[in-house]
Amino acid sequence: MLRLDNNKKEKNIQENPYEKEKNKITKKKKSNIKLSKFIAPFVSKKTLKDICECGNYVEYITDILEKKYKLYRAFFCKNRFCPMCSWRKSLKDSLLISILMKYIETELNYEFVFLTLTVKNIKGDELNDKIKEMNRAFTKMLKRAEIKNLTEGFIRKLEITYQKEKFITKELYEKKYDYYKKRNLKIGDLEPNFDTFHPHFHCVIAVKKQNNHNRISQKRWKELWQESMKDKSITQIRVDDIKKKSDNKEVFEVAKYSAKDADYLVNENVFNYFYKALKGKQLITFSGCFKDSLILYKLGKLDYLKEIDKTEYVYCVGLTWVKKEYVLDVFRELSVEEYKEINKRLIDELDCEIDD
């Protein structure tokens, strides 16, 4: 069994489901420890204690061949800045949003538009006011007749990224090729947005069936957003029609973290800006048919749209955090009661990889 194979070569570790899952949660726990140092001045002793103890012991369930590991239970602090908890929440939100979209598409016969609305990069002390400005502008934009007559509801998620690289790396250059090429910048040059923040909205908008008469072009979306923000310098927005509800790429974009721990844990000063900007903010908003469908989801009335987890789980695997790593603490067969409780249940999260 994989749990006993302690001499497995490094090159095979990524092929080992146990090691892969262990490495994933180890990375989040290490980020959680870093968070506890940065967040200490802002929270009570009890909250800090909960954050420090988050994920100290976790239990997985796995099949007889140990090909799939599913997180079964653990103590989670549920703090919105906790890397471990935000990771877990994003997986559950991915399922939630995908189910709402399935329901709205099949039962209400609406289509979807995926919209990313951006603003220019800003300094940390501008974040709070800029987010408020974006919220007002978004509300104003949706009141425009050409949008109001087309839309039936939306999900809006706030995300903030931080430009921590001082120089343009190969990875950055490939990601922002058009931006750099337009400015005659190359790999190794100073990154023009170094030490700035980029707040933006990821939105899924439910719309009536579109045709050539009522479809809003990307150019028009950009104009409407520029007018609502009163900023003609905004150039980067993205508009996509979501053709298939089975294509979850857009769902993951909306469900993923509002801020990546790799960004907000760069240093204490950067974290302070993120914390003050996001503390108390509503990060994800449901409106119209999405809000109505969310009520049905919470009541369990959309469970018929969920799939059954077909994996037969037979083992429980417990890991304890000791100093700087997780140590295998428990490996046992599930009890008869646990086996009945766990197996043949509806899925409660989407099994997906969300970028760190």
Protein language model features and the residues they cover:
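Short beta-strand->loop micro-motif that forms the acidic, two-metal-ion catalytic signature
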Residues: 202-206
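Right-hand nucleic-acid polymerase module
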Residues: 1-197, 207-356
